């Protein structure tokens, strides 16, 4: 490898890791000038400013849903604070990653992180570079992507604040119907899509609850014909299930019909709904800012 090529590698590694020139040179020399191996070397030796942030919790950020003529995807890009998530550099990174993901095939998140841009930088490298540049841990937490056919109606919805994104795939129907379902799911966040998805244990629990309520609150319930009692119980059970089952919920854009009826009226069937919300499932860190500032002052005084 020529000296010019070596210097180019050092420059690239410095951009990615924000580590000093000497450390980048040493890392590459110890890694046969392989960038990925050099990044690992810096990480193991604690030389990368960006990689030192790897143990921090990134629970803020943005989600985005995108589609083209063949594929649809939704992904979550995280930062440590919502302030950084509003930074134009972060937004530009999100858009770039979205374009790369949509244009590439990958099996899982690990594969997605290996996708390269036009300059030969992987998404993983872009994240490390952003971490070094912005000063917070930046991560691609999760991504869902699938292909679809002409027989399907597919629409995406990303809420204006970038905190919620939904994709809806229907068999039949049209884009307007798929869009309405996406907006409904974004707003109400149903736990289940179909009634049949609700676990039997939960259904039995609800049934017992509803039966007790019917005997206590419905006048002369025990004297009514069996078919009437069954109808009353079904209505009460469905009402309770509608709190968390999509198909039983009144449509957000037209409460006169349930989602199930709305789809049936438009010859559409739900095939897939995916909803991402920023930070869901992440245990956020409680930061004592006073203690953090004092610690930084003490570290500064030691220098």
UniProtKB/Swiss-Prot annotation:
TM ranges: none
The record's keywords, sorted A to Z, are: Cytoplasm, Elongation factor, Protein biosynthesis
Where in or outside the cell it occurs: the entry states: Cytoplasm
Q: Which GO terms describe its cellular component?
A: cytoplasm
One matching Pfam family: EF_TS
> What molecular functions are annotated in GO for this chain?
translation elongation factor activity
Which residues does the annotated region (Involved in Mg(2+) ion dislocation from EF-Tu) include?
81-84
Judging by the UniProt lineage, the source's domain of life is Bacteria
State the PROSITE patterns in the record: EF_TS_2 (PS01127)
Q: Does the keyword Protein biosynthesis apply?
A: yes
Keyword DNA-binding appears in the UniProt entry: no
Q: Which family does it belong to?
A: Belongs to the EF-Ts family.
What HAMAP family does the annotation carry? EF_Ts
The protein's name: Elongation factor Ts
Report the source organism. Answer: Mesomycoplasma hyopneumoniae (strain 7448)
Upper lineage: Bacteria, Bacillati, Mycoplasmatota, Mycoplasmoidales, Metamycoplasmataceae
């Amino acid at each position: 490898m020529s000296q010019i090529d070596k210097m180019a590698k050092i420059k690239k590694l410095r951009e990615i890791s924000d580590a000093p020139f000497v450390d980048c040179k040493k890392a590459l020399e110890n890694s046969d000038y392989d960038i990925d191996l050099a990044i690992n070397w810096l990480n193991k030796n604690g030389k990368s400013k960006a990689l030192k942030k790897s143990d921090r919790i990134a629970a803020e950020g943005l989600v985005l849903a995108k589609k083209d003529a063949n594929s649809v995807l939704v992904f979550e890009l995280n930062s440590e604070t919502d302030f950084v998530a509003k930074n134009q550099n972060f937004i530009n990174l999100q858009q770039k990653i979205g374009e790369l993901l949509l244009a590439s095939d990958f099996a899982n998140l690990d594969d997605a992180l290996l996708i390269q841009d036009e300059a030969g930088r992987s998404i993983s490298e872009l994240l490390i570079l952003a971490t070094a540049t912005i000063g917070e841990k930046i991560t691609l937490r999760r991504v869902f992507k699938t292909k679809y056919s002409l027989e399907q109606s597919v629409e995406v919805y990303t809420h204006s604040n970038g905190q919620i994104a939904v994709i809806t795939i229907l068999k039949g129907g049209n884009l307007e119907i798929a869009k309405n379902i996406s907006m409904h799911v974004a707003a109400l966040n149903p736990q289940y899509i179909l009634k049949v998805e609700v676990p039997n244990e939960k259904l039995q629990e609800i049934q017992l609850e509803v039966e007790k309520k019917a005997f206590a609150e419905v006048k002369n319930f025990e004297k009514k014909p069996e078919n009437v009692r069954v109808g009353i119980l079904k209505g009460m059970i469905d009402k309770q299930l509608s709190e968390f089952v999509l198909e039983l919920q009144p449509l957000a854009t037209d409460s006169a019909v349930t989602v199930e009826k709305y789809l049936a009226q438009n010859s559409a069937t739900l095939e897939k709904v995916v909803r991402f919300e920023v930070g869901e499932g992440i245990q956020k860190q409680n930061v004592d800012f006073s203690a953090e500032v004092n610690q930084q002052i003490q570290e500064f005084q030691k220098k």
